[in-house]
């Protein structure tokens, strides 16, 4: 697309169109642009080809004449294009105290991730509708988020009442309240399970228990097979040793490589005598 360099002359061209009858009505912007006309052309072009215009062009510094020659700078280098003052245009990183508390809690209690959680939320601010003056809530299960919100409430309450409480003290208090309620939950579930078993309730095994049971069945069967094979191997080993078929010589031969050959002197002499006798018989024949 061709660069439009006549944008500043739009008022002049429109007035000519009105006089010539091409345009019958004035545009809505005609009087405004006539009162405040554009002062300069912002099109960036080399100063070598336009030496009289663009006196107030902001990009004029990019096209300064080099020292020791008649050349002009027509394009910016890496230093001109690099972004300065990065902290001004950089999007600030959002940091919240709640995220730091969640990170600390779940690093100290990694098994809390294994508990089932409800990921469906209506508005996303259900925790703000709870009364965090106490840890246990009616419509929210006890989890790590309860510790986080309880810690924030303790900090805000300490400012209102004038009591000095640090973040570490508030987190410790909320954490110990969480431990106490968690122990109460586990104790009540254990007692209710024992009471139900006493009245005849039968609890099916979990998927983990069922898998361990099946694995143990295969392990028991293989233990019997492995024991029988071990007895057979030991019996064969004892039998070979008793018959003398596995002596010191056999062990040495088994350790030797197949590429190594050991010759006996008597075998060599006998073989040479046989070859000589065969040769003599052939000559006589």
Swiss-Prot record:
**What molecular function terms (GO) are annotated for this protein?**
structural constituent of ribosome
The record's section on InterPro entries has: Ribosomal_mS23_fun (IPR016939)
Reply yes or no: does the keyword DNA-binding apply. Answer: no
- Please name one Pfam family that this protein belongs to: MRP-S25
Where it mainly occurs, coarsely classed, is mitochondrion
Q: Where in the cell is it found?
A: Mitochondrion
Q: Give the highest taxon in the source lineage.
A: Eukaryota
Q: List the cysteine pairs that form cystine.
A: none
Write down any Gene Ontology CC term.
Answer: mitochondrial small ribosomal subunit
Q: Which UniProt keywords apply?
A: Mitochondrion, Ribonucleoprotein, Ribosomal protein
Which family does the UniProt entry place this protein in? Answer: Belongs to the mitochondrion-specific ribosomal protein mS23 family.
What subunit structure does UniProt give?
Component of the mitochondrial small ribosomal subunit.
* The protein's name in its UniProt record: Small ribosomal subunit protein mS23
Give the species this sequence originates from.
Answer: Debaryomyces hansenii (strain ATCC 36239 / CBS 767 / BCRC 21394 / JCM 1990 / NBRC 0083 / IGC 2968) (Yeast)
């Amino acid at each position: 697309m061709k660069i439009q360099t006549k944008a500043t002359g739009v008022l002049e061209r429109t007035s000519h169109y009105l006089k010539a009858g091409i345009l019958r009505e004035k545009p809505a912007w005609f009087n405004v642009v006539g009162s405040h006309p554009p002062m300069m052309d912002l099109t960036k072009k080399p100063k070598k080809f336009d030496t009289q215009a663009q006196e107030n062009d902001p990009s004029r510094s990019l096209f300064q004449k080099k020292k020791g020659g008649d050349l002009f700078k027509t394009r910016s280098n890496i230093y001109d294009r690099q972004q300065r003052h990065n902290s001004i245009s950089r999007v600030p990183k959002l940091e919240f105290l709640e995220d730091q508390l969640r990170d600390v809690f779940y690093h100290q209690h990694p098994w809390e991730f294994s508990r089932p959680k409800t990921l469906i939320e209506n508005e996303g601010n259900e925790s703000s509708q709870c009364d965090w003056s106490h840890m246990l809530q009616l419509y929210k299960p006890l989890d790590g988020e309860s510790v986080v919100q309880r810690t924030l409430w303790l900090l805000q309450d300490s400012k209102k009442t004038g009591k000095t409480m640090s973040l570490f003290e508030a987190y410790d208090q909320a954490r110990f309240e969480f431990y106490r309620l968690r122990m109460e939950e586990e104790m009540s579930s254990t007692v209710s399970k024992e009471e139900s078993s006493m009245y005849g309730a039968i609890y099916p095994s979990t998927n983990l228990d069922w898998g361990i049971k099946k694995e143990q069945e295969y392990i028991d069967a293989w233990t019997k097979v492995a024991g029988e094979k071990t007895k057979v191997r030991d019996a064969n080993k004892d039998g070979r040793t008793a018959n003398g078929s596995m002596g010191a010589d056999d062990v040495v031969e088994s350790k030797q490589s197949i590429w190594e050959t050991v010759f006996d002197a008597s075998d060599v002499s006998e073989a040479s005598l046989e070859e000589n006798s065969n040769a003599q018989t052939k000559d006589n024949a």
